[in-house]
UniProtKB/Swiss-Prot annotation:
This is Escargot/snail protein homolog. A zinc finger (C2H2-type) spans 1-5, 18-40, 44-66, 72-82. Gene3D superfamilies: Classic Zinc Finger. The keyword Flavoprotein does not apply. Pfam families: zf-C2H2 (PF00096). It comes from the Eukaryota. GO terms for molecular function: DNA-binding transcription factor activity, RNA polymerase II-specific; RNA polymerase II cis-regulatory region sequence-specific DNA binding; zinc ion binding. InterPro entries: Snail/Krueppel_Znf, Znf_C2H2_sf, Znf_C2H2_type. The keyword ATP-binding does not apply. Belongs to the snail C2H2-type zinc-finger protein family. It is found in: Nucleus. One of its GO terms (cellular component) is nucleus. It comes from Calliphora vicina.
Amino acid sequence: HQQFHCPSAEGNQVKKVFSCKNCDKTYVSLGALKMHIRTHTLPCKCPICGKAFSRPWLLQGHIRTHTGEKPFSCQHCQSAFV
């Protein structure tokens, strides 16, 4: 963090900042910016109701609300849950 704000005397390098075009957030890596952009584009859409999500695993969990699937169970009482 300090290297970003106070470049060393030997390098005096200014790190590139990646800015989101949809909001005022900035990132020090392109990968982090790409992950953030998904919060604006919501590329994962539910085929049943159309609700959109930024991450595939969020969609996967949502689909269980339609199917009623409860993939996890208590090892003591066998009660199932999402």
